[in-house]
């Protein structure tokens, strides 16, 4: 007797394991949505029932209650366009990463300006032509004086604020 597998009999239905994996992915996505702030949740295309469930999520603090509520959110996620939600979440994550990267870059500028010499200041003025060189030199001197006397870094904060304002103006965010 010859046993052979006939591909024509494959109906294209998902296996039970595949369905379970997809449902677990929906629960994981729902858990990710619960960590978002309400203003970010408002940007996502969600049903009212899912919005209410996400708003109720912080109320469930016991482990079993939280797990049960996440299962409920996963059930509600079945009716959602998860591809659109994932796309928007990825955009939000990317914008957050870009913001953090820009923030760290501005911090590095501040630190180099305080520790550096005129060459660093000239490079900064080339990168940010709207910078007021005199004001920046004054803030740098104050910050260096504060560091020398172990005072709180008030001028350092002012430099960062000034640099951030210049950056936002240059990027058209102001």
Curated annotation (Swiss-Prot):
Pfam families according to UniProt: DarP (PF04751)
CDD domains reported for this sequence: YjgA-like
InterPro entries the record matches: DarP, DarP_sf
Superkingdom field: Bacteria
Any Gene Ontology biological process: assembly of large subunit precursor of preribosome
GO MF annotations in UniProt: ribosome binding; rRNA binding
Segments passing through the bilayer: none
PANTHER family the UniProt entry points to: UPF0307 PROTEIN YJGA
Protein family according to the UniProt entry: Belongs to the DarP family.
Protein name listed in UniProt: Dual-action ribosomal maturation protein DarP
Organism, scientific name: Pseudomonas fluorescens (strain Pf0-1)
Gene label: darP
């Amino acid at each position: 007797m010859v046993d052979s597998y006939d591909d024509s009999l494959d109906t294209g239905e998902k296996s039970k394991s595949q369905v379970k994996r997809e449902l677990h992915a929906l629960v994981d996505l729902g858990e990710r949505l619960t960590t978002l702030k309400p203003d970010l949740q408002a940007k996502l295309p969600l049903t009212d029932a899912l919005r209410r469930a996400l708003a109720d999520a912080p109320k469930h603090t016991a482990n079993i209650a939280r797990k049960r509520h996440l299962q409920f959110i996963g059930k509600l996620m079945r009716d959602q366009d998860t591809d659109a939600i994932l796309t928007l979440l990825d955009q939000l994550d990317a914008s957050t990463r870009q913001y953090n990267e820009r923030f760290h870059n501005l911090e590095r500028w501040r630190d180099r300006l305080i520790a550096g010499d005129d060459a660093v200041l000239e490079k900064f003025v080339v990168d940010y032509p709207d910078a007021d060189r005199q004001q920046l030199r004054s803030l740098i001197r104050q910050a260096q004086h504060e560091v020398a006397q172990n005072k709180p870094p008030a001028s350092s904060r002012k430099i960062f604020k000034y640099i951030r304002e210049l950056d936002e103006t240059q990027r058209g965010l102001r």
